[in-house]
Regions:
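Charge-biased, low-complexity intrinsically disordered regions
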Residues: 1-257
């Protein structure tokens, strides 16, 4: 399993770095109660935080928005998209409650304020990544590394690259875009925004690489996310979790497992 950051990334973003968690031989088919509980708890916390501190005023979110602007890329950071998705679910639940379609809750309770809606489950590994995005407000990407024959590379988009959106439709790429690539297949475009179908984690995924992109202002939090993911993955999947940290001085990771 290999991940490399092209030196050109550091030319424009010298303070860029990434936390990694690699794991091989996971069973991603079976639901995990601990991960389900984590996703629900993270959803509850994120729902409360949305009431107290909107995304627009969150310093960490602004760091990623500023990086997109600096790179000339339009997009919504992955964690912001996930938080917005949760907000939509909460709003839908509140509308249903007003219409009398759900049981009423006490006005002084937490669920009375935001409901008890959690993000829909996808599969254990994806649920873990999305829960971490909600809890820490940082982007967390999970990549299916397949048979490990292809390295994951963070680089500029090139002619011949192919990106399929979540619906499987091919979308054109801009030449200035920063992408996560497995060969010519683009898994994430616009740096840390849009996840596609290529390289996406599915229930049958066995070998996985989690990547937490960050900058100087969010580095300490990203380290906490990496350590939290490694611990939870080890507990839930029962496999060895390999962690690493990449920056301009160490821009390549090769698994030793």
């Amino acid at each position: 399993m290999k991940f490399t950051i092209d030196p050109i990334i550091f030319e424009q973003f010298p303070d860029f770095s990434a936390g990694l968690v690699a794991m091989k031989g996971i069973d991603n088919l079976v639901a995990d109660r601990d991960i389900e509980a984590f996703l629900r708890h993270a959803s509850l916390e994120a729902g409360l935080l949305l009431k107290l501190r909107p995304l627009a005023s969150d310093h960490g979110v602004r760091v990623y928005r500023d990086a997109l602007a600096k790179g000339g890329m339009d997009g919504v950071p992955a964690m912001e998209r996930v938080i917005r998705e949760l907000g939509e679910h909460i709003a839908a639940e509140q509308q249903a409650a007003l219409a009398g379609e759900t049981a009423a809750r006490g006005p002084g309770s937490v669920t009375g304020l935001i409901g008890d809606t959690a993000l829909p489950r996808i599969n254990p590994a994806c649920d873990l990544a999305r829960g971490a995005e909600l809890q820490f407000r940082l982007p967390v990407f999970a990549f299916d590394m397949g048979d490990e024959s292809e390295a994951l590379v963070l680089r500029r988009a090139e002619a011949g690259d192919r990106f399929l959106d979540a619906d499987g439709a091919e979308q054109p790429l801009g030449g200035a875009e920063i992408v996560f690539a497995l060969g010519r297949e683009i898994s994430v475009r616009r740096f840390f925004c849009d996840e596609g179908k290529l390289g996406a984690v599915v229930p049958e995924t066995r070998n996985i690489l989690m990547v937490i992109p960050c900058f100087a202002a969010t580095r300490r939090k990203a380290m906490s996310v990496r350590n939290e993911l490694a611990r939870r993955m080890k507990d839930s999947f029962g496999r060895t979790a390999e962690t690493a940290w990449l920056d301009r001085d160490t821009a390549e990771f090769v698994s030793e497992i």
